[in-house]
């Protein structure tokens, strides 16, 4: 059994680690709440643009924006959003597994894939698989700006316009709640039809007067909508990261507490054994006299 002094040193070391994990848990909780506020603020903007696009696209007779046109799919571009830092449980691993499974399914249909990567964890992971990476970005921090994301996103959209790829998807961790984050792979381009599109079509029997003309408006709105979808996905992923880190650090703090209790028991037993040995030596010495 280790000596009492050695055990006491271990207890102090674990207590120091526990303070760090507790602080990280509190920081992650604060950041998660701020990110949730950004999520709530950006969703109405995205939903409103989606509804306007639906209406304008129906009014723009004779014109179909390339982002609305379905075509035979031979190659798909995936924008994968991961984290820059670790210590967030299996968040990235689950996302990578989901993405690789989807790529495998497409491969079985003779569909190849190109990647655009946001986040250093995804960059280091997918590089090892030898994928064709069309663009990458890292170091966004906890408050990503749309201007920073446009470069990688436009690389994928330009490839779609030029016919290099036939669809663009986005893979990220969707924030469900504090305890649940769901990895998803969803289609961006061609823009999938929303359930609300049919509802709006039934409800609205009137039309707008468009200024400028519907074509110009539609071109602009589609770009804004896709940018908002990417921003929303990145913010969702940041919220998921902070929630996963908060849970992981809480588990680490609790485990440290349990370990400290176990070490204290061992320390008390070692101290008791030491005292017993000293008493036995005293008794033996007295008996010898």
Curated annotation (Swiss-Prot):
Annotated function: Produces ATP from ADP in the presence of a proton gradient across the membrane. The gamma chain is believed to be important in regulating ATPase activity and the flow of protons through the CF(0) complex.
Organism superkingdom: Bacteria
GO cellular component, one term: proton-transporting ATP synthase complex
Pfam families per record: ATP-synt
InterPro entries: ATP_synth_F1_ATPase_gsu (IPR035968), ATP_synth_F1_gsu (IPR000131), ATP_synth_F1_gsu_CS (IPR023632)
SUPFAM superfamilies, sorted: ATP synthase (F1-ATPase), gamma subunit (SSF52943)
Listed PROSITE patterns: ATPASE_GAMMA
Assembly: F-type ATPases have 2 components, CF(1) - the catalytic core - and CF(0) - the membrane proton channel. CF(1) has five subunits: alpha(3), beta(3), gamma(1), delta(1), epsilon(1). CF(0) has three main subunits: a, b and c.
Source species taxonomy: Bacteria, Pseudomonadati, Pseudomonadota, Gammaproteobacteria, Pasteurellales
GO BP term, example: proton motive force-driven plasma membrane ATP synthesis
Record keywords, A-Z: ATP synthesis, Cell inner membrane, Cell membrane, CF(1), Hydrogen ion transport, Ion transport, Membrane, Transport
Keyword match Cell inner membrane: yes
Protein's name according to its UniProt entry: ATP synthase gamma chain
Membrane topology, as annotated: Peripheral membrane protein
Organism: Haemophilus influenzae (strain ATCC 51907 / DSM 11121 / KW20 / Rd)
Predominant location: membrane
């Amino acid at each position: 059994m280790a000596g009492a002094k050695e055990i006491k040193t271990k207890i102090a070391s674990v207590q120091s680690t526990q303070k760090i994990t507790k602080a990280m848990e509190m920081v992650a909780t604060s950041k998660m709440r701020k990110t949730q506020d950004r999520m709530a603020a950006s969703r109405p903007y995205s939903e409103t643009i989606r509804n306007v696009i639906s209406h304008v696209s129906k009014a723009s007779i004779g014109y179909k924006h390339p982002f609305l046109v379905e075509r035979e799919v031979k190659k798909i571009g995936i924008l994968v959003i991961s984290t820059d830092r670790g210590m967030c449980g299996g968040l990235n691993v689950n996302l990578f597994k989901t993405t690789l499974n989807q790529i495998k399914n497409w491969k079985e249909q003779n569909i190849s894939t190109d990647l655009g990567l946001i986040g250093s964890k995804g960059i280091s992971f997918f590089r090892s698989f030898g994928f064709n990476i069309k663009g990458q970005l890292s170091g966004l921090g906890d408050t990503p700006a749309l201007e920073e994301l446009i470069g990688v996103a436009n690389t994928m959209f330009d490839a779609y316009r030029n016919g290099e790829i036939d669809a663009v998807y986005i893979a990220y961790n969707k924030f469900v709640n504090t305890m649940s984050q769901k990895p998803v792979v969803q289609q961006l381009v061609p823009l999938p039809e929303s359930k609300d599109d049919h509802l709006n079509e039934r409800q609205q029997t009137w039309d707008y007067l468009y200024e400028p003309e519907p074509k110009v408006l539609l071109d602009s709105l589609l770009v804004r909508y896709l940018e908002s979808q990417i921003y929303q996905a990145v913010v969702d992923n940041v919220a998921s990261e902070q929630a996963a880190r908060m849970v992981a650090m809480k588990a680490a703090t609790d485990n440290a507490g349990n370990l400290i209790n176990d070490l204290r028991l061992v320390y008390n037993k070692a101290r008791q054994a030491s005292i017993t040995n000293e008493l036995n030596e005293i008794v033996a010495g007295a008996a010898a006299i």
